[in-house]
From Swiss-Prot:
One Gene Ontology biological process: fatty acid biosynthetic process
Site feature Plays an important role in discriminating NADH against NADPH, where: E75
Classification via InterPro entries: Eno_Rdtase_FAD-bd_dom (IPR024906), Enoyl-CoA_Rdtase_cat_dom (IPR024910), FabV-like_NADH_b (IPR050048), Trans-2-enoyl-CoA_reductase (IPR010758)
Gene name as annotated: fabV
Protein name in UniProt: Enoyl-[acyl-carrier-protein] reductase [NADH]
Gene source species: Serratia proteamaculans (strain 568)
Function noted in UniProt: Involved in the final reduction of the elongation cycle of fatty acid synthesis (FAS II). Catalyzes the reduction of a carbon-carbon double bond in an enoyl moiety that is covalently linked to an acyl carrier protein (ACP).
Length: 399
């Protein structure tokens, strides 16, 4: 079939296998261009490894420091006549590139919240790697099936206390609209913390520790976003912020346990990027379009792969203990939060309208980046080619 993008809401329902592979190879090339990370990790588990920051972490570990990697994700394979998910094709592309270089790469496709998935990963580590020296936790899921009860809990993207009203971008019609989001109730807040907070990360770390598969000096990191006053009402001061605060709590608890073996756990606060997760949050597409324009003009723009390369090289594996903020977090959002960047952001925000959106923001860049997530718009890819949606690779299927 000839595969074209089909957009529904903030999701692209198709993905291009060759385009996704090309996207992965571009990221690999960037990591290699930065040189080898001499004292980087060697045996790495990435939970949430198929897109965005998780995929970028797996690529940096493997191609920046020659690490053996195990990636966990929940993705959909394709068939002859139907495309799979972008994360499936990304992971297949990663697997192929890793094998070409003789790097160990195993993938587990299943529910990362389940005890079965944890046990499968532990067995794999024991069998193939013995122990791991890094754990990356990068899950972005709207639902969590509780491992003990089977209860399905859903997260909510909502403000707390009062309705949220703001200008936002309708990315289907390319016009500005007023977004109105009603506030969350107590149950929705609690459920969002259960799904997107630090509880599951702790379950993973406890299970890995009890199984004896964490090496001395193991580094554990989970990813977060704080943002600015433009996004706080819907994000940091909303249900998601409560979940991310719980991630901070978990990091301190995990860090205390890992200290005994010379290890450490951190939350890394990252910059805003175009991901399948961020495109679902009202206001983020508009904010990202503005901040991209400013940061590109100043030569400080980063995508997922650049952010994680900087995290590894300058924070986690620089050879010295990394600087943290007052909450023990690693801050990679430092360039985005510079006063000059944010002040310009606010100025543009105040004057934005349907007529000047492409002039004042990088909305065209945002849209191109969004399509790239699904393998569309990459150089050197024949988008008129007749392709099968079926791509096989070395993956343990728990689905």
């Amino acid at each position: 079939m000839i595969i074209k993008p089909k957009i529904r809401g903030f999701i692209c329902t198709t993905a291009h296998p060759a385009g996704c592979e090309a996207n992965v190879r571009e990221q690999i090339a960037y990591v290699k261009s930065r040189g080898e990370l001499k004292n980087g990790p060697k045996k790495v588990l990435v939970i949430g490894a198929s897109t965005g920051y998780g995929l970028a972490s797996r690529i940096n570990a493997a191609f920046g420091s020659g690490a053996a990697t195990i990636g966990v994700f929940f993705e959909k394979p394709g068939s002859e006549a139907k495309t799979g998910s972008a994360g499936w094709y990304n992971s297949a592309g990663f697997d192929k590139a890793a094998k070409e270089e003789g790097l160990y790469a195993k993938s587990v496709n299943g529910d990362a919240f389940s005890n079965e998935c944890r046990q499968t990963v532990i067995d794999l580590i024991k069998q193939d790697l013995g122990q791991i020296d890094m754990v990356v936790y990068s899950l972005a899921s709207p639902v969590r099936k509780m491992p003990e009860t089977g209860e399905v809990v859903r997260s909510a993207l909502k403000p707390i206390g009062e309705p949220y009203k703001s200008v936002a971008l309708d990315t289907n019609k390319d016009v500005l609209v007023e977004a109105v989001v009603e506030p969350a109730n107590e149950q929705e807040i609690a459920d969002t913390v259960k799904v997107m907070g630090g509880q599951d990360w702790q379950l993973w770390m406890d299970a890995l520790e009890e199984a004896g598969v964490l090496a001395d000096n193991v580094q554990a990191v989970a990813y977060s976003y704080i943002g600015t006053d433009l996004t706080w009402p819907i994000y940091w001061h909303g249900t998601l912020g409560k979940a991310k605060e719980d991630l901070d709590r978990a990091a301190l608890a995990i860090d205390q346990k890992l200290k005994a073996k010379g290890g450490a756990a951190y939350v890394a606060v990252l910059k805003s990027v175009v991901t399948q997760a961020s495109s679902a949050i009202p206001v983020m597409p508009l904010y990202i379009s503005i901040v991209f324009k400013i940061m590109k003009a100043q030569g400080i723009h980063e995508g997922c792969i650049e952010q994680i390369q900087r995290l590894f090289a300058t924070k986690l594996y620089s050879g010295t203990a990394p600087d943290t903020d007052e909450k023990h977090r690693l801050r990679l959002d430092d360039w985005e939060l510079r006063d000059d960047v944010q002040n310009t952001c606010r100025e543009i925000w105040a004057q934005i309208n349907d007529n000047n959106i492409n002039e004042l923001t990088d909305y065209l860049g945002y849209k191109a980046e969004f399509l790239r997530l699904f393998g569309f718009g990459l150089q050197g890819v024949d988008y008129e080619a007749d392709l099968s949606g079926e791509v096989k690779f070395d993956v343990v299927e728990l689905v």
